[in-house]
Amino acid sequence: MFSSTFTMTVYDELKAHLNEEVPAGFVQVRGGKEILGYVKKDWAMAVASRTSDWRLTEHMSLSEEAEVTPTKRAAAMIHAAEILDMLGLLQNPQHTELVDVRASVLDPVYCQAPRNLARAFGLLTTSVRMTGYLPDGTVMCAKRLATKSIGGGLWDSLAAGLVKASETTEQAIYRELFEEAGLTSNEVTLTEGGRFVQQLVVPEGMVREIVYHYDASKSANPANRDGQVMEFATFTPDKVLNLALGGEMMYAAGMGLVESVMRRMGQRIEDKWMHYRGQFLI
């Protein structure tokens, strides 16, 4: 059986994994005075040399004309993705759907950008995760496809994914729940948990996401619909925490369970990095 002390030990270790430094050789991506992300300098040069939408000095920035309206900002992001795709640098060029981009967790949407540009430019996007509980208190997890570029073959949350442009987090978690687990809104009971920001270095660039976590009590068996899950399995919460500690689970999925376990023990995590709805940031 786990304790709050052990759970917070897991929290500290996972938090360290989820907050990686910007690597050397990256430059800031800016829109006006806002820092939107980070990109490899040679990639920034490749884009800025092929379009007037972007300028490269000590950082990469939108031109004054491209920065004027949200529509023009989005067009510049799309053009940048097209250039990187043309050069064969994007890992998933087919993911052209738009996502919302923010300068920080507290800022409104600055612009929209293609999903396939988010990692390349290290853009701050929004994602959702759900820890699924069975009536006996065990946790349902999903194993990612071994061929996934990030976390292939690792255990993951029952459902997780990026929030699309103009989509609410609740709409996104229900969509992901149906796509990844085949469950509908009348088969689960959702509870909103905490929110944190993850920053990870990946081969393509950086993953920078505002992660909203939910719990769900489910009444039906999951069935994957999008082909992105190898298998589903149930574990006790302490087993899941040990999977996360052992590197056998996506770090963000482990963090979601840590937040959930603490909340179910009647304790919020007292750390500004983990934020709860209605909580004031000082």
Role assignments for model-derived ranges:
Residues 223-253:
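NUDIX/MutT-family hydrolases
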Residues 1-154, 162-178, 183-222, 237, ...:
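N-terminal leader/linker segments that precede catalytic domains of diphosphate-processing enzymes
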